Amino acid sequence: MSIKFEITKQNNIHFGIAAVAAALVGYFTSASWWGILLFAAAYFGLINVKLELPVKLSWLWAAILLVIGAILSVFSVQYVLLTDEDFVKTTDMICVVNMVLALAIYLVILFITNNTRLTCTIASIAILAFGFIDYFVYEFRGNEFTYADLKSAGTGLSVVTKYKFVIDYKFLYVILAAVLYIMLVRRIEVQFESAIHMRIISILLTIICVLYVIMNSMSLNTETWEKKGTYRNGYLLNFVLGIRDSFVKAPDGYSKAAVDKIAGNFKETDSSYSQSDAKNPTIIVIMNESFADLSVVGDFETNTQVTPFMDSLSENTLKGYALSSVYGAKTPNSEWEFETGNSMAFLPDGSVVYQQYINDDPTSIVSNLKNIGYTTVAMHPYYATGWSRNKVYPHLGYDETYFIDDFDQTKILREYITDQELYDKIIDRYEKKSDDEKLYIMGVTMQNHGGYGERYGNFNQEVYKVGGSYTDANQYLSLLNESDKALENLITYFKGVDDPVEIVFFGDHQPGLCNDFIKLLNGKGNSGLTEQELENLYKVPFFIWTNYETDAQKVDVTSLNYLSTLTLERANIDLPAYNRFLAELMEKIPAINSRGYYSKKNECFMHVDEATGDEAKWIKAYNILQYNSMFDEKDRSSLMFPYLK
């Protein structure tokens, strides 16, 4: 091996151009001049150096260049996408898995090109460009670029020119690092004596890398909220996990004939589901952020009643507890279960339906009500891009959508718009409706969103646990108390109107509180739980209230996927075919979620795959119908899942 240093006029010209370009870009991106000078020195050295390496060790030099490239690619992408605080959150193990994944990409390209220089150049530029795409997509809409976005790339490109993007100094640093890496690659001549041997080795190493990635990512979930995917899983791995979770396997026994056989039982409207005295009430649905009754986890004492008004509701009220499929986060899955009647029980753990599986117009309570003449309205006092609601709501069939800019942003508690402000907006929209307008409003609150550890000058904690100091729990309980006051104002208003009104209320999930507090309640915390104890962490309160006469009822346990069916029943609206199926399913399987189901036969919670007999039959039918509605566009049942008219 020999190293020679030779300065030429041509190299100096190239160096001057590169240095000036770096300085100009650095000026406009506020990059450190020390970084620019370091690049200039390294570039000057690389452009003038000549390396002669032993041909017999070509495989070693190729391996070194590929490994350096994989490490640099992963580091650069993470560095560009994450803040300094989030950058250090990624574990060493996740970093290694991402680097092995990147190495697999390099090896695949090497297999195709049989050229180390070309491979390293293509792979490093491609992976870095991939990271840049995610950066711009995040700036554009507030969540990351995923595999699902490839299906709607045309829509994104059609509006991207309307947005202004800012490039910061991190871009410059990783681009300069990539330039130096490519310069290094170009200075090293690597030739293989046998292209066939090289390709065999490349494919074998690729298989080893892929197996390593699979074995070390089987327990990982796709993360789609903001940039959690990048710092928890690494961006490259998170994207691949999104591909994995996008392909949901058809259930055993699935076929068009199987769907038709199930649907055939609900072809004619059963008289028990047909309402002759339909009131067509105004229907208001409130999904309240993190609203839960923690006493279902374990008993504890507070200085005052947390939700006195909601606890007092009984007249014209159906109330009880429902199983959510999420705990502490991933709100839109609860929203989706309510709207469609489908269940997370049959989807991959960690998936988020709004961002992974909605690409057409799913049948929902929204579309069904719209088809019978309702005006459908969605309200959420937060950003439209949150969980891609701005893209999903039109698919669901909402006529009107209201987001954070449509609310009075001075009406905040802690950092979020209050429940009361949302309810005032709902009342305002109700008062503007025409006399013959049938109205459906879905309101998703933000007031109680976690975390609960900071103190705020605009919020007084009035409720606290007696005995022990749990700052986050006390703040959370105080927020529930504020929600209860706002709820009382909402119900009081609609008690006084002449038109029939139905209000549906439920929590999306329990809050993410410190494990010590949960351990105080159930004696175990969040681990080592029985199926019953685990399901207690997924219970949320719900009620359906009307300002007209309906039976007072209590429900021990149901699940969010059934609430839209109960909503239509209490509104005296004829049930569509799928809701008739759900009504019968509810009799056999009272509650089902991502963790399991309640077995009437065994009088306990069980895993779905433990079901036997009639229960297994109904769960299988449910799975078949849900798969048909979500993934079989060609043979989607028009009876069970009609499109918007």
Model-predicted regions and their roles:
Residues 2-231:
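Transmembrane and membrane-interface helices of multi-pass
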Residues 215-285:
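Membrane-interface segments at or immediately adjacent to transmembrane helices
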Residues 42, 76-77, 156, 239, ...:
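Generic structural signal of hydrophobic/aromatic residues within well-ordered alpha-helices
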Residues 8, 136-146, 168, 255-256, ...:
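A diffuse structural propensity rather than consistent per-protein peaks
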Residues 270-278, 285-288, 293-645:
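Solvent-exposed soluble domains appended to multi-pass membrane proteins
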Residues 150-153, 233-236, 240, 307, ...:
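Alpha-helix initiation and N-capping motif
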Residues 10, 141, 149-161, 169-173, ...:
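Short alpha-helical interface patches
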Residues 132, 159, 187, 242, ...:
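Residues that form generic nucleotide/phosphate-binding pockets
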